[in-house]
């Protein structure tokens, strides 16, 4: 299970709208000062993803929840998104090269195959998105932001 913390934006009728920050690098290792990934992360836009997750328990905006998604579904979707355009590119380029015996035809076939593979991946991803095992789930819920209070006694404050 791949896990990530998210912040609740709203909750209505058993559906929680949560926001996840995009992290391209962790910024936690000792070599972060010379890390190329960290530098690239600072250059890009700081974006968030907002998704709807089913949740029977009422949630408060600002509350933290831990989301989880199965590794198998993530690997399958990555395989679909990356491999189908690549396979389409090679297959149609090879077919056009055999049929027309021209590099220009092979180039056109590669472009058409890549676009076709992308469209196939997009169509299948919409079908797979409806499956329950491809949906993120809420694994744990943190306390609401205003529930925890720290008080110090006057004796501790004077010392």
Curated annotation (Swiss-Prot):
Keywords: Cell inner membrane, Cell membrane, Membrane, Transmembrane, Transmembrane helix. PANTHER family: PROTEIN RSEC. The chain crosses the membrane at residues 73-95, 99-121. GO terms for biological process: response to oxidative stress. May play a role in reduction of the SoxR iron-sulfur cluster. May work together with the RsxABCDGE complex. Part of the rseD-rpoE-rseA-rseB-rseC operon. This is Protein RseC. It is found in: Cell inner membrane. Residues 1-72, 122-159 are cytoplasmic. The lineage of its organism: Bacteria, Pseudomonadati, Pseudomonadota, Gammaproteobacteria, Enterobacterales. GO terms for cellular component: oxidoreductase complex; plasma membrane; plasma membrane protein complex. It is a multi-pass membrane protein. Residues 96-98 are periplasmic. The keyword Metal-binding does not apply. Disruption phenotype: According to PubMed:9159522, insertion mutant shows a modest reduction in sigma-E (rpoE) activity. However, PubMed:9159523 shows that deletion of the gene has no effect on sigma-E activity. Deletion of the gene enhances soxS expression. Mutant shows increased motility and biofilm formation. Deletion mutant is more sensitive than wild-type specifically to hydrogen peroxide exposure, but not other stresses. Pfam families: RseC_MucC. Belongs to the RseC family. The keyword Repeat does not apply.
């Amino acid at each position: 299970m791949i896990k990530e913390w998210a912040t609740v934006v709203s909750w209505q009728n058993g559906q929680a709208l949560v926001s996840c920050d995009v992290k391209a690098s962790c910024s936690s290792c000792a070599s972060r000062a010379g890390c190329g990934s960290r530098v690239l992360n600072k250059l890009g836009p700081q974006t968030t993803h907002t998704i709807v997750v089913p949740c029977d328990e009422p949630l408060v905006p600002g509350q933290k929840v831990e989301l989880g998604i199965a590794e198998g579904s993530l690997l399958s979707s990555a395989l679909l998104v990356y491999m189908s355009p690549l396979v389409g590119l090679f297959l149609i380029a090879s077919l056009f090269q055999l049929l027309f015996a021209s590099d220009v035809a092979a180039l056109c076939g590669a472009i058409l195959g890549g676009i076709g593979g992308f469209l196939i991946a997009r169509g299948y991803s919409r079908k797979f998105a409806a499956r329950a095992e491809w949906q993120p789930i809420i694994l744990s819920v943190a306390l609401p932001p205003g529930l925890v209070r720290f008080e110090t006694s006057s004796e501790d404050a004077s010392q």
